[in-house]
């Protein structure tokens, strides 16, 4: 989902937004995958009625969005070879982090976990940034058979660990 608007409150990868959807009382917290001046990129998984409604929004739909929520990742701590580890919906905010770390000349490795090969997303985008990508799938249909923690065993020389996603 791409949103046009004021992105000045977003200061670090890993922050999130809260979307107010018409017909729903509760806002939907969605992590920011990437942002630039005037545009937000959000990637979400349909898990309920709210995110289902988001898939049906027409281009140009006006939304009430609270931006710049959460602390985000501290880019100054990554060292020369940061390791990014995430699973499922924890992967999108790591993309924005990888983009900024590679722009700083860091050697980024991303270990990305999925339930099965058919659910893999953003892996090629990480590679396009110059990041090394290790895939782990719970069912063994792609990459390393297991969880992201199993994929971490393939990387031993990292200088800092960034994580986002569900507990293994």
Where in the sequence are the language-model features?
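FNR/FR-type flavoprotein reductase catalytic core
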Residues: 49-168
């Amino acid at each position: 989902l791409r949103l046009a608007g004021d992105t000045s409150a977003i200061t670090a990868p890993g922050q999130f937004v809260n979307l107010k959807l018409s017909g729903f009382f509760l806002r939907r917290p969605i992590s920011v995958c990437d942002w630039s001046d005037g545009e937000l990129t959000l990637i979400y998984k349909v898990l309920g009625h709210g995110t289902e409604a988001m898939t049906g929004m027409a281009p140009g739909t006006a939304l009430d969005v609270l931006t710049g929520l959460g602390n985000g990742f501290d880019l100054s701590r990554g060292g020369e070879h940061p390791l990014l580890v995430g699973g499922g919906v924890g992967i999108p905010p790591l993309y924005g982090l990888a983009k900024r770390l590679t722009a700083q000349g860091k050697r980024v490795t991303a270990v990305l976990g999925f339930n099965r090969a058919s659910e893999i997303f953003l892996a090629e985008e990480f590679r396009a940034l110059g990041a090394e990508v290790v895939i782990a799938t719970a069912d063994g249909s792609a990459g390393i058979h297991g969880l992201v923690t199993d994929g971490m065993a393939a990387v031993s020389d990292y200088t800092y660990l960034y994580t986002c996603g569900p507990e293994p």
